[in-house]
Design a protein with these regions (language model features):
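Short, well-structured N-terminal submotif of metal-dependent ribonuclease cores
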Residues: 1-41, 50-66
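Active-site neighborhoods of divalent-metal-dependent phosphate/nucleic-acid chemistry enzymes
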Residues: 2-6, 69-116
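Generic structural signal for small/hydrophobic residues in well-ordered secondary structure
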Residues: 11-12, 49, 81, 106, ...
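Alpha-helix capping/helix-boundary segments
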Residues: 14-15, 45, 77, 101-102, ...
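Nucleotide phosphate-binding site architecture
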Residues: 15-16, 47-50, 122, 129
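Short, polar loop motifs at secondary-structure junctions
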Residues: 55, 116-119
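Active-site regions of enzymes building and remodeling cell-envelope glycoconjugates
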Residues: 68-69, 125-130
């Protein structure tokens, strides 16, 4: 991971793994935090997490999300996401708009995107890292 980038945006796949206490992402997040990285997520990821919330996970989910900086989707980010989606469609590659909003958020803030779904974010402008 590029040491000049001091922020890491956690994608929904990583948040789910943290909620399920999978060892690899928990250890990685702990290390990133100790190394001084800002740990963040997007408002889009928050919506995705709450949409798939299981009964009994409410408090644990709130606790996890409260430890992260939540980056909003601004009009500039929304436009960037639309531009990326349209450009990818023109070359025959389709991506979900919600994923492109997450990608645009990471790009706009200069954050590395931590995801377990690299194929969803195959765009040249973004730095990806996997747990």
């Amino acid at each position: 991971m590029n040491s000049e980038r001091r922020g890491v945006l956690l994608d929904t796949s990583v948040l789910i793994n943290l909620l399920h206490r999978r060892k690899e992402p928990v250890a990685l997040i702990r290390e990133l935090s100790l190394r001084g990285f800002v740990l963040a997520t997007s408002a889009v990821n928050v919506a995705e997490i709450y949409a798939g919330l299981r009964i009994g996970e409410e408090q644990e989910t709130r606790d996890l999300l409260s430890t992260l900086k939540c980056l909003p989707v601004t009009p500039k980010i929304a436009r960037k996401a639309g531009d990326i989606t349209a450009a990818r469609r023109r070359i025959g590659r389709t991506h979900w708009l919600d994923d492109m909003m997450v990608a645009a958020t990471a790009i706009e803030h200069g954050y590395t995107l931590l995801t377990d779904n690299r194929k969803d974010f195959e765009i040249p402008e973004i730095e990806l890292f996997s747990a």
